[in-house]
C-alpha cells in the first residue's frame, strides 16, 4: 500500500515524523506537509499566490501552503504515482466535536476524500503539549492493518482521537459521533508595545454535548475515538421544513 501523509503542524512536527516512521514500517509513504504550523487553516486553498514545493529527501516535501494545498498538489499531478489513501496527523492536540470545522488536520483528510481516496485524520488528545505520539502512531498502524484486511470505501473519512496515554493504558477503540462545545470564550484584547490594540482568538468553549457515544466521552475514558465524517453538510432532516418556509416567500 502507498500512503500520502500530511498534517497542519508543519513538516518538522514530532507527530508527522513519528507517523511516517511507524507507517513506513508497513507501507510505502510520501510526506507532503506545510513548511510551518498552519493549525486552524481548515479547508483553505492558496489561489492568489504561487505555491513552492521544496524536496527535502526522497518522498518528503515541505510546501509553502496550507494542509489542503499539500494534498491537492500531491493528488493532482505532483506525484508520479497515485497513493492508495491519505493519513493526516498526528495532530498536537485533540480534534473533537466542533474542532473539525477549523482543523487543518481534518481538512487534509477531507481533501483526500474530495479527490477520491479514503482518508484518516489522527490527533493526540491531551494538553497543549501532548507527549505520547508513539501511542497514536501505533494506533495508526492498527487501523491501517484493519483497512488492508477490510478496505474502506473511497468516500470514507475517519476522524481519530487518541488519548495522550502510554500504549498499555489505552482501553481500546470506540466508534463515536462528534460531540459539540459551548460557544467559544471571549476574544482576548491586549496592546502592543506601541499602544495599539491587538486581539487574540479566545479558547474554545467547554464541552456541551459530551455524553456516552461522543468522541469527547470516549477519549475522556481512555478509548480511541473513531468517528466517520462526511463532506455533505446538508441537513437532510430540515429540507421539508425549508421547502414549506420558502412557500411563504413572495416572488
From Swiss-Prot:
Its cofactor is a divalent metal cation. Keywords: Cytoplasm, Hydrolase, Metal-binding, Nucleotide-binding. GO terms for molecular function: 3'-nucleotidase activity; 5'-nucleotidase activity; exopolyphosphatase activity; metal ion binding; nucleotide binding. One of its GO terms (cellular component) is cytoplasm. It catalyses: a ribonucleoside 5'-phosphate + H2O = a ribonucleoside + phosphate. The keyword Nucleus does not apply. Its EC number is 3.1.3.5. Binds 1 divalent metal cation per subunit. It is found in: Cytoplasm. A divalent metal cation binds at residues 8-9, 39, 91. Belongs to the SurE nucleotidase family. This is 5'-nucleotidase SurE. It comes from Halorhodospira halophila (strain DSM 244 / SL1) (Ectothiorhodospira halophila (strain DSM 244 / SL1)). The gene is surE.
